[in-house]
Amino acid sequence: MQSVVFPNKILPYLLVAPQIILTVIFFFWPASQALYQSTMREDAFGLSSNFVGLANFSAVLSDESYLNSLKVTVIFSVLTALVSMGLALLLATAADRVVRGKGFYRTMMIMPYAVAPAVAGMLWLFMFNPAMGTLSYILRRNGIMWDPLLDGNQAMLLVVAAAAWKQISYNFLFFVAGLQAIPKSLLEAASIDGARGSRRFWTIVFPLLAPTTFFLLVVNTVYAFFDTFGIIHAVTGGGPAKATETLVYKVYNDGFVNLNLGSSAAQSVILMVIVIALTAFQFRFVEKRVHYG
């Protein structure tokens, strides 16, 4: 295999410079500022600040409301990942069997991914609004008292549904690509041997989708931790009674609403460490069970 040699020694650095600049500006600089702010205590107007060391971290980790947000985040992330990946795999399997109009169905499935998180949240809020929502009216007609603005469990179900619906399209794309990469000869051979559809799926298709599933597991975890702020802010605002206040929403609430910048910065640092540790754990242990090829 012939190696690529750049005639100009500066050219490789120029090619990677835009990515490095963006990474420094949008990751390393904010991360360093958050780390610095987490060791300071400022007044509400930002006129004075004092170095307090790890006092902000100690206060955050001993705060019951923060521990509640951690529990809410775990529940929300697990449910969102399971629902979005499960439905995406089901829809991808169904779309892969379509003979006519396959491109149309796949295009329609991808469209929800273009919807902004806040817009996705508002769509679901309108459908399940206890006062004027069509689906909430159907629930009440069937004897189900639906009011996510007062019931924390119902609020959690609503934000999970909105977040999962938003992410299904992304997962669908990768599952369809994974299904197309599976040799049809394997499925035909299993069919000749008498294996039914469900058996072929669980013994052949699903194991071969393990790399795709693992990748999506990492992506969906990061998505649930960071990219669902707009949905929660639009639908519940972290309520009722902080039942849907995730870690990222608490960072916003304490920093921009309560103006407790030191605590908010400490929470953002802890959140960053949690996501890095969780991703490293998934790559370290989960990937061992993934077989490529």
UniProtKB/Swiss-Prot annotation:
UniProt main location, coarse: membrane
Compartments where found: Cell inner membrane
Gene behind this protein: ugpA
Stated family: Belongs to the binding-protein-dependent transport system permease family.
Protein topology in the membrane: Multi-pass membrane protein
Record GO biological process: transmembrane transport
UniProt source species: Agrobacterium fabrum (strain C58 / ATCC 33970) (Agrobacterium tumefaciens (strain C58))
Chain ranges passing through the membrane: 10-30, 72-92, 108-128, 156-176, 204-224, 261-281
GO cellular component terms attached to this protein's record: plasma membrane
Record's keyword terms, sorted: Cell inner membrane, Cell membrane, Membrane, Transmembrane, Transmembrane helix, Transport
Highest taxon of the lineage: Bacteria
Subunit structure: The complex is composed of two ATP-binding proteins (UgpC), two transmembrane proteins (UgpA and UgpE) and a solute-binding protein (UgpB).
Name the UniProt record assigns to this protein: sn-glycerol-3-phosphate transport system permease protein UgpA
ABC transmembrane type-1 domain residues: 66-282
One Pfam family from the record: BPD_transp_1
Cited function: Part of the ABC transporter complex UgpBAEC involved in sn-glycerol-3-phosphate (G3P) import. Probably responsible for the translocation of the substrate across the membrane.
